[in-house]
Amino acid sequence: MNISNDVSLLNKKIVYDLTPFSHLDFQDHLSCIVWLSGCNMRCSYCYNKDIVFAKNGKMTFANVLKFLDTRKNLLDAVVLSGGEATNHNLISFCKEVKNKGFKVKLDTNGINFKHIKELLDLNLIDYIALDYKAPKYKFEQITYSSVDNFEKFKETLSYLININFNFEIRTTVHNDLLIDDDINSILDDLSKEKYKGKYFLQNFLDTQNNIGNIKISSNKLNLENIQDNNDSIKIQFRNY
C-alpha cells in the first residue's frame, strides 16, 4: 500500500463513534472503543442498529489518532468494533495505533478471513473476540447472510486455533432464536476443533433499538442442560 492510499484511508469518515474509556471491553486493559460503520450481517438481536446501517461515519481514523495522542499513559489499548470492523481496511490505522504504543483488540464475526489473516501476519492485533453466531443449520436464520459465510467464519476459527492466537469466542443468546441444543452443537464443534479457551454466552440485551425489534423472550435457556464436559473450554456467562 502506498503513502497516498494510507492517507486516503486515514481520512475517510468511516468511524461511527468513539467511546473514550472502557475497563470492560478488553480484560485487564483500559481502552477506548472505535465503532466502525456498516456490517455484513443483519442479526435480529443486534442493538447497534444505527451503526450497522450507517453508510458513513462521523469521524476519521486520523481523528482517532489525534485523540490517542491525548491519552498516552491513560489508556493502553484500542478496541475495534462495529458493525463489522473488518469491512474496512484496518492495516494503516492499526500500524499507527501500534506505533503509538497501544494494544489492539478486534471484535469480529470472522467472515473476512483474508483481511484478518493480513492483520495477524503483520502482528497488528493482540486479541480477538470472535462471534460464533449459530450452528451452521441456523446461521442464515440468525445472521441474514449466506450460509457460505459460515465456512468463512470456520476458516478464521480454525486458523486462530492452529496458530495458538490469544482469542475468545462468544455467542449472543436470544431464547426464541437459539436453544440449549444449539449451544451444545456449538460446544461439540469447538471440541472437534480442539479449541482451548473462554466461551462466553451473552444474554440478549433488551434495548429500544435492535434490528429485529425483538423483545425479551418468555423462554429461558436452561443452563443445566449446557454440556460442560470439556475442561479445555471455559464457559462463562454475561448478562445472566
State each model region's role.
Residues 33, 37, 58-61:
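Electropositive phosphate-/nucleotide-binding environments in soluble metabolic enzymes
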Residues 1-35, 42-53, 71-72:
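N-terminal [4Fe-4S]-dependent radical SAM core
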Residues 35, 81-82:
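A secondary-structure boundary/capping signal
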Residues 1-24, 173-240:
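Auxiliary Fe-S-binding modules of radical SAM enzymes
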Residues 39, 85:
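Hydrophobic adenine-recognition pocket in adenosine-nucleotide-binding enzymes
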Residues 66-76, 86-216:
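Conserved AdoMet/S-adenosylmethionine-binding subsite of the radical SAM
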Residues 54-61, 146, 150, 216-219:
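Flexible, glycine- and charge-enriched loops at secondary-structure boundaries
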Residues 49-79:
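Conserved alpha-helical substructure of the radical SAM core
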